[in-house]
Amino acid sequence: MVILLQFYKEENFKKTEIGEIPEDWEVRELKDILEVIRNGLTAKQNKDKIGYPITRIETISDSKIDITKLGYVEDIKQEDIAKYRLIIGDILFSHINSEEHIGKVAIYEGKPEFLLHGMNLLLLRPNKNKIEPYYLLYLLRHFKQKNIFKYIAKRAVNQSSINQTQLKHLKIPLPPLEEQKQIAKILSDFDNLIGTINKQIEVLNKAKKGMMKKLFTKGVFEHKSFKKSEIGEIPEDWEVVELGNEKYFKIIMGQSPPSSSYNKEGEGVPFLQGKAEFGNIYPNPVLYTNKPLKVVDDEDILISVRAPVGDVNIAPFKLCIGRGLAGIKSNKEKVDNFFVFYYLSYIKPKIEYLGGGAVFKAITKKDLESIKIPLPPLEEQKAIAKRLKAIDDLIEIKRKEKEQIEKAKKKIMNLLLTGKIRVKT
């Protein structure tokens, strides 16, 4: 509510070449509000951290400057250092990239303290007397969301590009400078809040990982004696079983029904081809089929058997599974599905490297059957799963909170950057 009190609805608009904008806004070309627009330094780079840090195309792949994705240059002239060193407020723009990444932007905020501008990213240096750098950052992100950069890009095989001339003549809405700063602050506040939630999720995931390591080796009950096993030391009363042990498990490999049977109208059985619709625990299928071939039931385990392999979910109801998935049914008198679900997610890295240590694009039924899991008594399985489910519930609450904030930010950003709502300055 505090943020909403800063807004008022605009009533007076004028027609322009980019659509309706408030009467006191301008339309300017990008070149008119920049001090510099240019490509980066062409130089031989290394990843051994020898020399000066320099940006690479992947440095901004997550729409921020990622200091773990930098290159380094050794031989460089002093005049090039002066020319290509980034200053706070510089914006990097991805103008040569796949269609998915074209138009991504990131702003330099001073970390690392010394950073050179490398090739395959354009530098946009705002004239701070005309435009607030963060306003321009959010405006360019807004344009990307609206697919403007996809529209103006020149397409080639696996790559798109936008030349400097096109970008220089890109027309942008320009509010008064003080309003730009207010818009940028509001959107930055949203980003800071999202960043805080991301850190909370990161802490919870780290705690979950540590909890898993302890629970799957020491258990949840007090154990006084332990034994060595093929998967490491475990409590004396635990077993080690393979997923291929029919006393405990049954594996169903997915098979895709005819594509003519697919629909989104809810006819037949919900259908999953692969892990695309996987959630944190449960999937959210969008397709249905009226000709199911391979079916799993409520609470059966789902595992991805095609790249990326090893991801797991729990079936929330009866589902048809395609060839990208397998289902694991458990003997419920001996096995708690959620315990197995959590253990498989814990050993996902090992599942990815099944067979000689190489990453496989697919795993077979035989591979799945060979996976060994610890099996405590059923009561302890349930207790372990309950503890892990509790922390997962906290993570899910945070994810939903983040999702709601992101939706609110997107809506408000659209209203602010089109002038439909204004900021009181």
Swiss-Prot record:
Family matches, as InterPro entries: Restrct_endonuc_typeI_TRD, Restrct_endonuc_typeI_TRD_sf, Type-I_RS_S_subunit
GO terms of biological process kind: DNA restriction-modification system
Pfam families per record: Methylase_S
Gene Ontology molecular function: DNA binding
Alphabetic keyword roster: DNA-binding, Restriction system
Described purpose of this protein according to its UniProt entry: A putative specificity (S) subunit of a type I restriction enzyme thought to recognize 5'-TAGN(6)TGC-3'; the other subunits are unknown.
PANTHER family: TYPE I RESTRICTION ENZYME MJAVIII SPECIFICITY SUBUNIT (PTHR30408:SF12), TYPE-1 RESTRICTION ENZYME ECOKI SPECIFICITY PROTEIN (PTHR30408)
Domain comment, as recorded: Contains two DNA recognition domains, each specifying recognition of one of the two defined components of the target sequence.
Entry similarity comment: Belongs to the type-I restriction system S methylase family.
Protein name: Putative type I restriction enzyme MjaX specificity subunit
Organism for this UniProt entry: Methanocaldococcus jannaschii (strain ATCC 43067 / DSM 2661 / JAL-1 / JCM 10045 / NBRC 100440) (Methanococcus jannaschii)
Origin organism lineage: Archaea, Methanobacteriati, Methanobacteriota, Methanomada group, Methanococci
